[in-house]
Amino acid sequence: QYYGYPYAAVLPQPVADTPEVASAKAAHFAAYNVAAAAAAAAPDYDAVGVVAPPYPGYSAYVGPLAGIPAIVNGVPADTPEVAAAKVAHFAAHAAANHY
């Protein structure tokens, strides 16, 4: 039968903090506890819980509509630049394939 690894005592241990890191953590938690105690001793009862809603004047796009090429069978038509690029592309394919 299989019972697992025979040397369970040599499993890798988690990475330990260096003395500098441990000291910095202790200083941080001490400062945090001082700040938390000060905040608990003087609660802020005048905090504003509700802010005014944003002004809705700029919530809609009011620019000019873009010129849409004519739609053919539900598909927008190519712009002149795209049509010229397609012609050049297919001409290059035809030249490369010797047609």
UniProtKB/Swiss-Prot annotation:
Reading the lineage from the top rank, the first entry is Eukaryota
Q: Where are the sequence repeats?
A: 16-31, 77-92
Entry GO MF terms: structural constituent of cuticle
Q: Which residues carry this modification: Pyrrolidone carboxylic acid?
A: 1
Which keywords describe this protein according to UniProt?
A: Cuticle, Pyrrolidone carboxylic acid, Repeat
Q: This protein is called what?
A: Cuticle protein 2
* Organism of provenance: Blaberus craniifer (Death's head cockroach)
Lineage in the entry? Answer: Eukaryota, Metazoa, Ecdysozoa, Arthropoda, Hexapoda
